[in-house]
UniProtKB/Swiss-Prot annotation:
UniProt source species: Syntrophus aciditrophicus (strain SB)
Function: Aspartyl-tRNA synthetase with relaxed tRNA specificity since it is able to aspartylate not only its cognate tRNA(Asp) but also tRNA(Asn). Reaction proceeds in two steps: L-aspartate is first activated by ATP to form Asp-AMP and then transferred to the acceptor end of tRNA(Asp/Asn).
This protein's UniProt keywords: Aminoacyl-tRNA synthetase, ATP-binding, Cytoplasm, Ligase, Nucleotide-binding, Protein biosynthesis
The name this protein goes by in its record: Aspartate--tRNA(Asp/Asn) ligase 2
Group of enzyme by EC: ligase
Binding-site positions, L-aspartate: E182, R228, H455, R496
Lineage, broadest ranks: Bacteria, Pseudomonadati, Thermodesulfobacteriota, Syntrophia, Syntrophales
Annotated GO CC locations: cytoplasm
EC identifiers of the protein: 6.1.1.23
Gene3D superfamilies in the record: Bira Bifunctional Protein, Domain 2, GAD-like domain, Nucleic acid-binding proteins
């Protein structure tokens, strides 16, 4: 084993070799993925970041290299020099990118040994995630994880290329900034110099990118880290990366057009997938009405239909009372519902109860009526109208929920997804984009007993709705837009407020006192008085976008060094306690 590499500089990566390299002498460097002995000849699957290639140690070709190869084990680090050749007839491996060739090794140098890893790097499953994260530097050697990280790099590079070719300027914004909570908790950083004060790590560059528009930079982008101290899920991290964009002198349509260009560029260059534009658009009200969610998966049908007007005077008490109490009745049509047994229908009832629904009615559509526990409570005309609105045909199953609008949409919106998975209605290879627009600008918080911003307080209201701000802020629609991909929000943004008087109206509607507004946002209000142009922007979650492009199950599989769902790093043992001396320097005390 050598402290220095004596074999000359690497000439190729393993995974980049093919039949066109046959006859060439190559120098490769990487790791032993798998070792096999066959009749005195040693075969090694040799790995680097670009993939695998089979290298061969034959005593007749190079006795010295063959003798040295007896020492090597899995994950040893090697440098080899040898000749590429086409594999013998019948020995081609079609499951391997480089399966048509192999490298006959003439010279071997063992650069380092390795202990036996705590898990198999060949396995794609059945490994405890905690073990993987504790030994993340080993987990990152696994081919699938490396492919994910390589695609992430490609997405970032293509993003920069796209924006720079469209006249955008990449500008960095501060990480140490002022705490202006935007919905989640801030990560706070104590100042040693200014004792008793704190910076906050940014939840987004929102204010700074708006100030860049005030500064005249016109088209800004940045691939930037953001931080939110919130409870984690499979697709959330305390620190995450977003593609951040802001533009001046534009409308919603301008931003949407550019962002559709970005998405089609990324999917074409990184996955060789093409899409037609423009993408479909739904208002928030349409999305909730048809899908029960503001992030609908439009790869399949099973849309919700409102039957409240038909069933408001129904003989079924639960329907009648829901309508009379300001609630609603909605249904989903399940084509070829004969696939659902009575037990399946009972299970669906249990499923919707998770979302607050008190029951789920069902009906099997026959040629001459229904088979249903509720059939006897309905008139023939009601059944006829329901069949017409649901476009029901013989063999379909209809499922109904009657409750408050929130419960109905939540339960049926989630049931729709559940059914699609159960009935295999989703094409996992399909990507379906949809824009959701005109969100409510504000929503009432039962916890805070006031209206709060649905997105953030700098979102511009729809001009026709400004009149509702003083007395009925819940009616105001936002000039906001989300891009949804396969049922997941991958980006969101809005047209911003560029006039101080409108921004002041928003703060008033949010119940914020002048003193609090000046303390948190005084510099922004001041900037709005110095010729702020109309502007707007958007941010895409890079982690989530790459997760969907790779088909990964968790966002942690597309981040090099992610945190756990408890926001810890098992590899470095962060967060950790610090010394009393460090705390004293910061004038802090643990209580």
């Amino acid at each position: 084993m050598s402290d220095f590499i004596t074999i000359k500089k690497r000439t190729h990566y393993c995974g980049q070799l093919d039949s066109s390299d046959s006859g060439k002498e190559v120098i490769l460097m990487g790791w032993v993925h798998r070792r096999r002995d066959h009749g005195g000849v040693i075969f090694v699957d040799f790995r680097d970041r670009e993939g695998l290639v089979q290298i061969v140690f034959n005593p007749e070709y190079s006795p010295v290299a063959h003798q040295e190869a007896h020492k090597i084990r899995s994950e040893y680090v090697l440098a080899v020099r040898g000749a590429v050749r086409n594999r013998p007839e019948g020995m081609v491996n079609p499951d391997m990118k480089t399966g048509a060739i192999e490298v006959m090794v003439e010279e071997l140098e063992i650069l380092n040994e390795s202990q036996t890893p705590p898990f198999s790097l060949e396995s794609e499953s059945d490994i405890s995630e905690n073990i993987r994260l504790k030994y993340r530097y080993l987990d990152l050697r696994r081919p699938q994880i490396q492919r994910n990280i390589m695609l992430r790099n490609r997405v970032a590079a293509e993003t920069r290329q796209f924006f720079q070719s469209n006249g955008f300027i990449e500008i960095e914004t501060p990480f140490l900034t002022k705490s202006t909570p935007e919905g989640a908790r801030d990560y706070l950083v104590p100042s040693r110099i200014n004792k008793g004060t704190f910076y906050a790590l940014p939840q987004s560059p929102q204010i700074f990118k708006q100030l860049l528009m005030v500064s005249g930079f016109d088209r800004y982008f940045q691939i930037v880290k953001c931080f939110r101290d919130e409870d984690l899920r499979a697709d959330r991290q305390p620190e995450f990366t977003q593609i951040d964009v802001e533009m001046s002198f534009i409308t919603e349509d301008d931003i949407i057009e550019i962002m559709e260009g970005l998405m089609t560029h990324l999917f074409s260059r990184c996955l060789n997938r093409t899409f037609s534009t423009p993408f479909p658009r739904l208002s928030y009200a349409e999305a909730i009405g048809r899908y029960g969610k503001d992030n609908p998966d439009i790869r399949f049908g099973l849309e919700l239909r409102d039957l409240t007007d038909i069933l408001a005077d129904s003989g079924l008490t639960v329907f009648r009372e829901a309508a009379a109490g300001g609630g609603m009745i909605k249904a989903i049509r399940i084509p070829e519902g004969k696939r659902l047994s009575r037990k399946d229908l009972d299970d669906l009832q249990n499923f919707v109860s998770i979302y607050g629904a008190r029951g789920l009615a069902w009906a099997r559509v026959l040629a001459d009526g229904w088979t249903s526990p509720i059939f006897k409570f309905l008139t023939a005309d009601e059944v006829r109208q329901i069949n017409g609105r649901m476009e029901a045909v013989e063999g379909d199953v209809l499922v109904f929920v009657a409750d408050t609008p929130t419960v109905v949409n939540d339960s049926l919106g989630n049931l729709r997804i559940h059914l699609a998975k159960k009935l295999n209605l989703i094409d996992p290879e399909q990507f379906a984009f949809v824009w959701i627009t005109e969100f409510p600008l504000m929503e009432f918080s039962d916890t805070e007993k006031r209206y709060v911003s649905t997105h953030h307080p700098f979102t511009s209201p729809v001009p026709d709705d400004v009149k509702y701000l003083p007395g009925e802020p819940g009616k105001v629609r936002a000039r906001a837009y989300d891009l949804v991909l396969n049922g997941s929000e991958v980006g969101g943004g809005s047209i911003r407020i560029h006039r101080k008087e409108i921004q002041s109206l928003i703060f008033e509607a949010l119940g914020l006192e002048n003193e609090e507004v000046r303390s948190k946002f005084g510099f922004l209000l001041d900037a709005l008085e110095f010729g702020t142009p109309p502007h707007g922007g958007i941010a895409f979650g890079l982690d989530r976008l790459v997760m969907m492009m790779t088909g990964a199950e968790s966002i942690r599989d597309v981040i090099a060094f992610p945190k756990t769902q408890k926001a810890t790093c098992l590899m470095t043992d962060a967060p950790s306690r610090v010394s009393i001396e460090q705390l004293m320097e910061l004038s802090l005390k643990i209580v």
